[in-house]
């Protein structure tokens, strides 16, 4: 029946460095919602947030989705009569369920979730707390530690520490003693490996800290370990379900931004060629990781696996994983018997 159809607001774009990834993910999700099995379940209203934070209605959002991601949006916007609003497009009043397809700051850090909460309408994914903890690597690691979950050794640094020579010298010595080289330097609140660097000596460490500090005031430095990288997808709120476990192998020195979004630089193995015992442990730890930070609805949990030591460590949790052609989240569910059209429907129904 027509009145049973739900109107879903797909919000994409955003002000973060993962703007283009968000556009690609939104394309995939909207295409899945227009599949024959979903056409009589959902109406879609697409809302585009440009890089300056302005919200644009479906008229323009659809043009963004249809166009080459490299086209000049500023020129395009000048050609249409409708000009961007500082407030919400009027058609958002029709939206019954929000589906934020936003990555990085302001998209999966609790900001947009707080806004959705104020509208009184349900939304796909974690709430404010789960999103905030899942975005900030320092807070996430603290929550994992409190839950007794295995992690690689790390140190936390604040950008203000870099201005105090004595404090910085102490922290460098601490990193060299506790973590050693090589090590990874990560901005605490960015995704898709944006701003991450690998340091093999003190000079590279200092350069990596400077780079991270330009992007975030909170920085994580992690010990480098020789390990395989495993991933597990999660869905559900009251009952959390896990997918099969996948593995990512890459030709570069580490799993950087280019590796994540280039077809030729990575190889995915689904299911991962690992012992069943390890696979079950990954699935179990994935559920515990979600509970530790109050993540729900959708998540992907990443792990390090040292097969020689038969050891697992949680790397991080992503509370709004990508839906691009190279994204593991939909591929893991597809291999688990849930295709993309079924998956997006389940995510909306779990809101």
Swiss-Prot record:
Mg(2+) 1 binds at residues 302, 316. It is found in: Cytoplasm. Its cofactor is Mg(2+); Mn(2+). Pfam families: Dala_Dala_lig_C (PF07478), Dala_Dala_lig_N (PF01820). One of its GO terms (molecular function) is metal ion binding. Pathway: Cell wall biogenesis; peptidoglycan biosynthesis. GO terms for biological process: cell wall organization; peptidoglycan biosynthetic process; regulation of cell shape. PROSITE patterns: ATP_GRASP (PS50975), DALA_DALA_LIGASE_1 (PS00843), DALA_DALA_LIGASE_2 (PS00844). GO terms for cellular component: cytosol. InterPro entries: ATP-grasp, ATP_grasp_subdomain_1, D-Ala_lig_Van_CS, D_ala_D_ala, Dala_Dala_lig_C, Dala_Dala_lig_N, PreATP-grasp_dom_sf. Residues 141-349 form the ATP-grasp domain. ATP binds at residues 176-231. Its EC number is 6.3.2.4. It catalyses: 2 D-alanine + ATP = D-alanyl-D-alanine + ADP + phosphate + H(+). Mg(2+) 2 binds at residues 316, 318. Keywords: ATP-binding, Cell shape, Cell wall biogenesis/degradation, Cytoplasm, Ligase, Magnesium, Manganese, Metal-binding, Nucleotide-binding, Peptidoglycan synthesis. Binds 2 magnesium or manganese ions per subunit. The keyword Cell wall biogenesis/degradation applies. NCBIfam families: D_ala_D_alaTIGR, PRK01966.1-4. PANTHER family: D-ALANINE--D-ALANINE LIGASE, D-ALANINE--D-ALANINE LIGASE A. Cell wall formation. Belongs to the D-alanine--D-alanine ligase family. This is D-alanine--D-alanine ligase. It comes from Prochlorococcus marinus (strain SARG / CCMP1375 / SS120).
